[in-house]
């Protein structure tokens, strides 16, 4: 497969601040990824960064079955507060199995399977994503070292193996609620994610405001 190429960019005002959106594309498959960039990220200093895998249900439809939408909002807010950073929107929906298969996996979860068991039952690996493209994107953006917003050790290891210096893991524990606590448990126990649970009551953070609301109301 040919290496991904930087093809276009534009200004993108958001509720979190003004970013530069940079489009990337594989020349052979036309597979697309994007990065949101704020500030000077080519000065050699570690950059606050997030690799965010596409999740239509969480990011756009505000599903409570996962923590994706909440993580997206929190990451953009933290980058904006620092005035400098990169968020790669990694276009591998459903941990790489695609939207329709993710819905099929949801149906199996409705019958009692966890998120890993459902993927395996459909003939997929627990996680089909390839994060190496994100290292190529960081390289093309001039980013050499990152403070990575993640709970996922696989992202850290892939970046390190590809030559991106991960100087710090910045935890991203947000959005826990009664609908996704089992999902988060599974990611921690079966995938090694660094999940810290709220030990009092399950709360979720509203992606569009600064307040927190109880998930059980």
UniProtKB/Swiss-Prot annotation:
Domain of life: Bacteria
CDD domains from the UniProt entry: GTP_cyclohydro2
Active-site residues per Swiss-Prot or TrEMBL entry: 127 (proton acceptor), 129 (nucleophile)
Enzymatic reactions: GTP + 4 H2O = 2,5-diamino-6-hydroxy-4-(5-phosphoribosylamino)-pyrimidine + formate + 2 phosphate + 3 H(+)
Record SUPFAM superfamilies: RibA-like
Enzyme class: hydrolase
HAMAP family found in the cross-reference section: RibA
Function: Catalyzes the conversion of GTP to 2,5-diamino-6-ribosylamino-4(3H)-pyrimidinone 5'-phosphate (DARP), formate and pyrophosphate.
Name of protein: GTP cyclohydrolase-2
Origin species: Actinobacillus succinogenes (strain ATCC 55618 / DSM 22257 / CCUG 43843 / 130Z)
Record lineage: Bacteria, Pseudomonadati, Pseudomonadota, Gammaproteobacteria, Pasteurellales
